[in-house]
Amino acid sequence: LSVEPRPAFYALGGGGWRDYVTLLHPPYTLWHLSYVVIGAALAPSLPVERLAWGLVAFALALGVGAHALDELNGRPLRTSIPNGVLAVTAGVSIGGAAVIGLVAAFAWTAWLLPFVAFGSFIVVAYNLELVGGRFHSDSWFALAWGAFPVLTGYVGATGTLRPEAILAAAFAASLSLAQRHLSTQVRDVRRRATRISGQVVYKDGREEAVVAETFTRAPEAALRAMACAVVALAATLLALHV
C-alpha cells in the first residue's frame, strides 16, 4: 500500500488548524524574517520599534499573504482552506503590510516608498505567476525573498543605503538562490512525481533501491540546517545591540 508523500517536510496532516500552520511554511517564514533582522541589525544603532514594525509587515505580506496566494494558485500544499478564505487572508495581510509601510515611510524615511511599491507588486506577481510566470523564477525569488528583506530592514532602520547593506543583500540573495535550487527538486518529487524506481550499484557490490527519499533526504536536511543557520545569524547580530 503506497502512501502519498506530504507536500512539504513541514506539512502537518489532518486538516483543520493544521492546514493553517502548514500554510505559513514555518521554517521558511522564519528564515526570511531573519533577513529583515539582519538588515536592521547592521545599523550602527538599532531602532527596536522600527524593526518590530518591519517584522510585522513582512510577517503579514510574506508569511501570510504570499503563502495564501501561492496556495490559491494551484493548491501546492493540498490544504482544505476555502478559496474565499485564502483570497481574503491574502488581501487583508498584504494590504495591512502596505499600510504599515506607507505609515513608516511618512513617519521615518521616504526612502521606504519604493520598497513598499516593489514589495506590494512582487508578492502578487510572483505567487500568482503573472505575465506568464515571468516573475516566478529563481532570480526573482533570490531578489524578492533574499535581498529585498535585508535592504528594507536596513533602510527602515537607517534611512539610507551603505555598502554593508548591499553586501548583506548579496549574501541573502545567494543563500535564497541555493534554497530555491534545493527546494525545487524536493517539490518536484513530493508533489509531481507519480512513480520513482531504479537502483544504485556501488563498486563494492552493494545495491540500493532508488526511492523518493533518495532525492529528498539530503536537500531537506540541508534546508533545515540553512534555516537554523540564518535564524542563528540574525539572533547573533541582534545580540550585539543588547
What kind of region is each of these model predictions?
Residues 1-80, 85-123, 143-242:
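Hydrophobic alpha-helical transmembrane segments
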Residues 128-140:
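Membrane-helix interface "capping/anchor" motifs
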